[in-house]
Every structure is written in C-alpha cells, then in structure tokens.
From Swiss-Prot:
Family assignment from sequence similarity: Belongs to the venom Kunitz-type family. 02 (native) subfamily.
Disulfide bonds: C37-C85, C46-C68, C60-C81
UniProt keyword annotations, A-Z: Disulfide bond, Protease inhibitor, Secreted, Serine protease inhibitor, Signal
Sites marked Reactive bond for trypsin: K47, A48
Function per UniProt: Serine protease inhibitor that inhibits trypsin (Ki=5.54 uM) at a molar ratio of 1:1.
Tissue specificity annotation: Expressed by the venom gland.
Protein name: Kunitz-type kappaPI-theraphotoxin-Hs1a
Length: 88
C-alpha cells in the first residue's frame, strides 16, 4: 500500500504541474512577476489626495491616490508611466 500512495502523490503533483505551468508563462508575467501595467487603478485605503498616473491599457491617465496601499500601477509622472508601460 505504501507504493500506491507514493505513485498517487507523484501522479497528483504531475497533473498539478501540467495544469499550472502554462499560467506561469502567460503574457501577464515578465521575469516571474505580474505585469503591473495590466493592473487596474487602485486609490488605496487611505484618504489623502495625491495625483498619480496609471496605465489603462492604451495610455497613461491621472487618478487620485489615497497615499497608502494600492498596487504597482501608479506612477508619479506621466513620463514615468509611459516609460514603464507604453509599448513601442
């Protein structure tokens, strides 16, 4: 019975690898990290009012950032946003 459990575990892990590996190679990942330019704008959980720029899929647009939290799709300037996210 011990060998049957080992074979079952190997089979399970093999199937898990085959199912999840393509997601790691998808277009949303670069160098093992999620492409921040595809994330939605996120004002964060705080109540401050800072002007920031985010990439909306076509260009960089302004949004109001609350000062904490949020995600990586926030840039201090339009130039910084375009440099990181615009495709040549």
């Amino acid at each position: 019975m011990g060998i049957a459990r080992i074979l079952s575990a190997v089979l399970f892990l093999s199937v898990l690898f085959v199912v999840t590996f393509p997601a790691l190679l998808s277009a949303d990942h670069h160098d093992g990290r999620i492409d921040t330019c595809r994330l939605p704008s996120d004002r964060g959980r705080c109540k401050a009012s800072f002007e920031r720029w985010y990439f909306n899929g076509r260009t960089c647009a302004k949004f109001i950032y609350g000062g904490c939290g949020g995600n990586g799709n926030k840039f201090p300037t339009q130039e910084a946003c375009m440099k990181r996210c615009a495709k040549a």
